[in-house]
A protein has these predicted regions:
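Soluble extracytoplasmic regions of secretory-pathway and membrane proteins
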Residues: 4-567
Length: 567
């Protein structure tokens, strides 16, 4: 019996070790006391199974001819110790949660995101062109990306595009990027050696998407399995790191990486979460590197995600004058603008993106906690460094601006997307897209923050911008707006007198605007010229390096509208 008992114990130990290995492999908990998941893993996975085994192993028995006979009860000390340890884990979670409560640390929460006051007109450059404005929402990017991949027959059967698009600033221009993903387990199994072949890059200004094929496939991705699963690969490299916000980015040369934010907790065990650094993983070989916030490469754009930053500002706005004031007096309490989330059926903090100084910044309006449909200011926060700027500007909140834009074309039933914020003649201005029921962008709209009765809409962004500037100059009086010259494209852009130019073509772009195709030519000296393709189909014969003579008229945005062109 003693020999059999030893074998049983050995078998139980092997089973227990296999249990620990398998559960860790699947659950991937951070081995960090600041993680609630660590304490739950310790209690329910590590301690509970041996505690249950010890609980049922309470007696010594003896086998006789008459059967099994209980000899004596065994004092169940191991079970008591193990259940006591489980209770201690639960107590640590409860005490840690209470110790980090806002009731005791209101000032600590309020000081996590440090904001500085800035003048809007001095900090945000006046907008002279709209090439740096990212107006596209994720749903529109998904639609364009799926359309691009759907046209590639060799890919569509094995891969699809991840819905997790990242907003980045690449070489000074906004861009949305998303990696392809395996279309299921068997597609991964069949392609696991060569990996995911590329990613989709979406231009939110031109509203188009391109598939980028990589020289070396990405093997360590979220849609992979077993050891090439991205999260598992990062966890095995950094077993104690509490990481999240894992997303896809590309550097300035277009090389792919996955970036994961690494969190720390400044208040108690589990309170005051913020980012202390980032893990950057090369998905082609699985190599991972950790960087503190101050050392993160400049090409990385999303380290502090928008949800975290808006939550941290709400701590600042609501708890700055103490916890009890946030509940009762609410003196000086403010919060980020909220929009209605139909999926969760509640209001959540929302934000837009602004490309500034080579980084992506989130912006959102700041309103009082009384929900009065007006803003008292704005914040702009750098997603890489968490540098936060506050602008004290009273005006309409984003929801009111969206309603004003929708009201301009209410008979069409278009819906406005969450706006971006720009500076026009030192006036803060909302700019947004209006989409139909299918999610297709139909119009662009601009709304003055301080006077949201100043609204313009147009089928393309340049025309909307031109009309808005005229309306602002006229003080919002549409009757006082001088329509000016009408160019040969039929829009209302005011043009200067015709001039003759001789230039050498440096680049050629075909852009779809309002259902028409326009040809944009960039000269070697930086001059931008455009003409509607339907008006001059000979434009298709132009090549980079051609020297051309044009008669053109310059618009207020600096673009030259071509009247005649010859080589």
């Amino acid at each position: 019996m003693k020999g059999n008992k030893g074998i049983r114990i050995a078998i139980l130990i092997v089973i227990y070790l296999l249990w620990l290995g398998c559960t860790y492999y699947v659950l991937l908990p951070a081995l960090n006391p600041h993680s609630i998941g660590f304490w739950l893993y310790l209690a329910l996975v590590v301690l509970l199974p041996p505690a249950l085994v010890s609980l049922f192993h309470t007696s010594d028995v003896k086998v006789t001819k008459k059967g099994v006979k209980m000899v004596k009860a065994v004092a169940n000390t191991p079970a008591k110790i193990l259940f006591g340890a489980i209770g201690a884990c639960i107590i640590i979670i409860l005490i840690g949660d209470i110790a980090g409560a806002k009731l005791f640390h209101a000032k600590g929460y309020a000081s996590i995101l440090k904001t500085e006051d800035y003048e809007f007109s001095e900090d945000i450059n006046q907008q002279t062109a709209l090439s740096m404005i990212a107006l596209m929402d994720t749903n529109s990017a998904i639609r364009l990306g799926n359309r691009e991949i759907g046209s590639l027959s060799d890919l569509v059967s094995q891969y699809d595009v991840s819905d997790d698009y990242s907003q980045i600033d690449r070489n000074g221009a906004p861009q949305k990027v998303s990696a392809l993903r395996y279309a299921g387990f068997f597609k991964w199994w069949g392609n696991r050696d060569k990996g995911v072949p590329g990613y989709v890059a979406v231009d939110p200004v031109e509203q188009n998407a391109d598939y980028v094929k990589l020289e070396k496939g990405m093997r360590y991705v979220p849609s992979a399995y077993f050891n090439t699963d991205l999260e598992r690969n990062i966890r095995f490299h950094y077993p104690t790191a509490i990481f999240g916000n894992t997303h896809f980015e590309v550097d300035e040369e277009g090389n792919p990486y996955y970036v994961a934010s690494v969190y720390t907790y400044k208040i108690g065990l589990f309170g005051g979460d913020t980012v202390k650094g980032a893990i950057i993983c090369d998905p082609t070989n699985g190599d991972c590197d950790y960087y503190d916030v101050a050392e993160i490469p400049a090409w990385v754009d999303d380290v502090f995600d928008g949800e975290l930053l808006t939550k941290q500002y709400n701590w600042t706005g609501e708890l700055g004058n103490g916890f009890w004031n946030s509940l009762f007096g609410k003196k000086g309490c403010k919060k980020c603008t909220e929009t209605y989330n139909s999926e969760d059926e509640n209001y959540v903090a929302d934000y837009g993106y602004v490309a500034k100084d080579g980084d992506i910044w989130i912006y959102t309006g700041i309103t009082s906690v009384n929900d009065d449909a007006s803003n008292i200011g704005f914040i702009l926060v750098n997603q890489r460094t968490s540098e936060a700027h506050y602008y004290s500007i009273a005006g309409a909140d984003e929801n009111s601006a969206m309603s004003a834009a929708e009201g301009e074309v209410q008979e069409k039933g278009y819906q406005a997307s969450f706006p971006s914020l720009i500076n026009v003649y030192d006036k803060p201005t909302y700019v947004m897209v209006l989409k139909d029921a299918s999610g297709i962008v139909k119009l662009y709209a601009m709304v003055n923050v301080e006077q949201y009765n100043i609204v313009t809409t147009a089928s393309n962004l340049d025309d909307c911008f031109s009309k808005y500037k005229k309306l602002v100059k006229a003080g919002g009086d549409e009757d006082a707006v001088d329509d000016g010259d009408t160019n040969d494209d039929g829009d209302e852009t005011k043009l200067k007198d015709p001039v003759d130019l001789e230039v050498t073509i440096a680049s050629i772009e075909y852009v779809a605007i309002g259902g028409d195709t326009y040809v944009y030519l960039e000269a070697e000296d930086g001059t931008i010229l455009r003409q509607k393709f339907a008006d001059n189909e000979s434009l298709i014969s132009l090549r980079i390096g051609d020297k051309i003579k044009v008669n053109a008229q310059q618009s207020e945005t600096g673009t030259y509208y071509i009247n005649t062109i010859s080589k």
